[in-house]
Swiss-Prot record:
InterPro entries hit by this protein: BTB/POZ_dom (IPR000210), SKP1/BTB/POZ_sf (IPR011333), T1-type_BTB (IPR003131)
Keyword vocabulary terms for this entry: Ubl conjugation pathway
Native source species: Danio rerio
Matching SUPFAM superfamilies: POZ domain (SSF54695)
Pathway participation: Protein modification; protein ubiquitination
Domain (BTB) ranges: 12-81
PANTHER family with a match to the protein in the record: BTB_POZ DOMAIN-CONTAINING PROTEIN KCTD6, POTASSIUM CHANNEL TETRAMERIZATION DOMAIN-CONTAINING
Protein name per Swiss-Prot or TrEMBL: BTB/POZ domain-containing protein KCTD6
Free-text function comment from the UniProt entry: Probable substrate-specific adapter of a cullin-containing E3 ubiquitin-protein ligase complex mediating the ubiquitination and subsequent proteasomal degradation of target proteins.
Domain of life: Eukaryota
SMART domains assigned to the protein according to its UniProt record, in alphabetical order: BTB (SM00225)
Assembly description: Homopentamer. May be part of a cullin-containing E3 ubiquitin-protein ligase complex.
């Protein structure tokens, strides 16, 4: 294999199925730490398993893998302020044998300045699809925004009145929009505008993930999730 082919292989996208959660990244990211389990796995020194779709399968905690992958991408550990699964994440780091991450998790220093905290926005798109139609037919789509930043939810209510007729559920920390089979394309438009609005409020995308489910004999459900974060300063009473 010449240098050009090898370089293309390292940057070529690869999809992993980790406990039912799909993640797409590059081989070079997975091999950032050659002595790790993932480094050995994608060097050919470790046996691999594929799922029915041909994705590499790892039978581990799919939710926590987002932090593993982000560390591989940036060599930095960033966790939500209210993160409560540190012991579980340590076990995942031990499993993947990522020594720098293990050291970060054992470092007692705070991840952020003590006078700041992290605000989080979760955006999810749930789409139910008919299994037996060709082309695939959308049955229903739901778009949900979840956050404790009430000013953001108020801004969405005030600036996205075009989609008010689709607003089906509003709660203290959540707002949802529902779209039927004839107007699911409007969900795409709303989602694009929402992502732009959220980023303009100072949030950056921390993580994206996709989850496929088959709940009924004639339906498939596809869930897309985006996590946005920003730092905020604590206000003294």
């Amino acid at each position: 294999m010449d240098n050009g082919d090898w370089g293309h292989r390292l940057t070529h996208p690869v999809t992993l199925n980790v406990g039912g959660h799909l993640y797409t990244t590059s081989i070079s990211t997975l091999q950032r730490y050659p002595d790790s389990m993932l480094g050995a796995m994608f060097r050919g020194d470790f046996p691999t398993t594929r799922d029915a779709q041909g994705n590499y399968f790892i039978d581990r905690d799919g939710t926590l893998f987002r932090y593993i992958l982000n560390f591989l991408r940036t060599s930095e550990l960033t966790l939500p302020v209210d993160f409560t699964e540190l012991d579980l994440l340590r076990k995942e780091a031990d499993f993947y044998q990522i020594e720098p991450l293990i050291q970060c998790l054992n470092d007692p220093k705070p991840l952020y300045p003590l006078d700041t905290f992290e605000q989080v926005v979760e955006l999810s798109s749930t789409r139910k699809l008919s299994k037996y139609s060709n082309p695939v037919a959308v049955i229903i789509t739901q778009l949900t925004i979840t956050t404790k930043v009430h000013s953001l939810l108020e801004g969405i209510s005030n600036n996205f009145t075009k989609w008010n007729k689709h607003m089906m559920d509003t709660r203290d920390c959540q707002v949802s929009f529902t779209f039927g089979p004839c107007d699911y394309h409007q969900e795409v438009s709303l989602r694009v505008h929402l992502m732009d609005y959220i980023t303009k409020q100072g949030f950056t995308i921390r993580n994206t993930r996709v989850h496929h489910m088959s709940e009924r004999a004639n339906e498939n459900t596809v869930e897309h999730h985006w996590t946005f974060c920003r730092l905020a300063y604590k206000v003294e009473d």
